[in-house]
Every structure is written in structure tokens, then in C-alpha cells.
């Protein structure tokens, strides 16, 4: 099984984190989004990552579809869940994935005012999850589930930003903060990205081109010749 990837794409990390959580063997192939190879364009109708190439040599695209396939084709992370619970989990997972690009935009903010505005949008999703979380280690209990996997890219990036730039997207949300720490402690965040993920992430989001990096005016440029928002799904 192979995942075609771009190093700092949160949609890719959702897929690779699920593969790691299920202990499924896979390989990663990174491509340049500024010079997409023809073989990739042939199997990705939207020209976006991730693409999962199954052991049966079938190319699957769109991260939502890929994670549904992995949950159906391999033993589920949480067995014996009801149809209602699975639907609820999909809804909370969707709240995460629809905010991946919101967080990406906030991380690229050129100044404090823009950062505040964009962070407020992400904060609304965080507020909703803060109210939903209980006293268990993870979203649905004491084991990692599909909702945890969906939220991991958001909380991982928030952790990296806080560590490198001192800005805390999670803020004063104690349950969300505890959940973030539990997820980081699983090791799934590090296992589901490239070894040089933090360097690549910092070069794009925490450079002198962004307020979180050094502040000041930012030019509208793209990482490695391709905007993240145009290339991830």
C-alpha cells in the first residue's frame, strides 16, 4: 500500500495517522506540487493529495473517502459501535477536516489583526469540541478512534506552532488541551509525518514571511511552487 503525499498537508496526515493506528504497512511517496508527474495526474482526478494506492493497485482519492475505505477494509479502531455512534463520529470528524485549511490560513497570517480574525474561526470549532469532550483519555473512550484521528492534524500543528512560535491556538480550553497532550503522547503525530516535517512546516508557516514567524508584511507566495490550499483534499 502506498500513500502519495505532500509533506505538510494535514489531509495526508489524517490518512497516515489512521494507517499507523491500525498498524497497516504502507510506504510514502512525496511529489512536487509545482511539477506533478503525469502518472500522478492520471490517478488523481483533482490533482490533489493524498492518493492511496491499495495492494490491489487501485488508486483512491479524497481523504474522506480514503479513511472510510480503511475503516471498512481493516479491523475498526472501535468495535461494536452503533450506526448512530458512527454517524456522530463522522460529523465530529468533518468538523475537524473542514477546519484544516482554516488553520493553514491562520498560520500564514501577515499580522496580528489577521491572525486574530482567522484564529477566531478556528476557535469556534475548538469551543464546540471543548464542550463535547468528556473525562476519558480520547474522544470515545480510552482508545484512539476515528474522531481522534481526524483532529490529530489540527492539534499536532497547534503543538508545533506553540513550541516554535509561542502562540497557543488551543488557548484556555482545559479539556481540549488535555486531549491534545494525550494524542501527542501516543506518538501517532510523529509517526504519521516525514522525519523533517517540522522543518518543512516551519519553513512555510513560521518563516519571516509570516506573523507567527517574525511578523511584518508577508508576500503572497507558495511553498515549493504550489499553494497548500490548492493541493490537499
Walk through the language-model features, giving the residues of each.
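A contiguous, mid-protein "functional segment" used to position or interact
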Residues: 166-204
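GST superfamily/GST-like fold recognition
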Residues: 141-164, 175, 183
